Amino acid sequence: MRIQSLLLLGVLLAVGSQLPAAFGRKKGEKSGRCPPDDGPCLLSVPDQCMEDSQCPFTRKCCYRACFRQCVPRISVKLGSCPEDQLQCLSPMNHLCHKDADCSGKKRCCPSACGRDCRDPARG
């Protein structure tokens, strides 16, 4: 009985260590995505983290203003943003900053003139 318990524990530990990779994440990487980095570059600021495991709670280690720091993660909707073939003549303000700013299944996507809410690409 004791050998079976140890064997079962070993199998569970082995499978559990592979779960992040099975879900497309590296070991220690937290769920969610980094918010867009729209800030100006602050070159003299040192990185505050190198990976998600160095950040408290649900925060993620993300590039913000050209250095890494722990920031609140954002959730991402299914689907990918469509490609934008246009060129912008006069940049406009962002109409969204994250997927949660968009209604329904729409995603906050980068475009030639800024971010806006769009239906995800098909295929």
UniProtKB/Swiss-Prot annotation:
Q: What is this protein called?
A: WAP four-disulfide core domain protein 5
From the Swiss-Prot or TrEMBL record, state where the protein is found: Secreted
Query: What role does it play?
Result: Putative acid-stable proteinase inhibitor.
Q: Which cysteines are joined by disulfide bonds?
A: 34-62, 41-66, 49-61, 55-70, 81-109, 88-113, 96-108, 102-117
Species: Callithrix jacchus (White-tufted-ear marmoset)
Q: Name one GO cellular component term.
A: extracellular space
| Gene3D superfamilies given in the database record | Elafin-like
Instruction: Give UniProt keywords alphabetically.
Output: Disulfide bond, Protease inhibitor, Repeat, Secreted, Serine protease inhibitor, Signal
Q: Which residue spans adopt a coiled-coil conformation according to this UniProt entry?
A: none
Q: Name one Pfam family in it.
A: WAP
Check the UniProt entry and state the signal peptide residues, or none. 1-24
Q: What is its main location?
A: secreted
**UniProt GO MF annotations:** serine-type endopeptidase inhibitor activity
Q: Which SUPFAM superfamilies match?
A: Elafin-like (SSF57256)
Record-level GO BP terms: antibacterial humoral response; innate immune response
**Domain spans labelled WAP:** 27-73, 74-121
Keyword Disulfide bond set for record = yes
- Is Repeat among this UniProt entry's keywords? yes
Highest taxon of source: Eukaryota
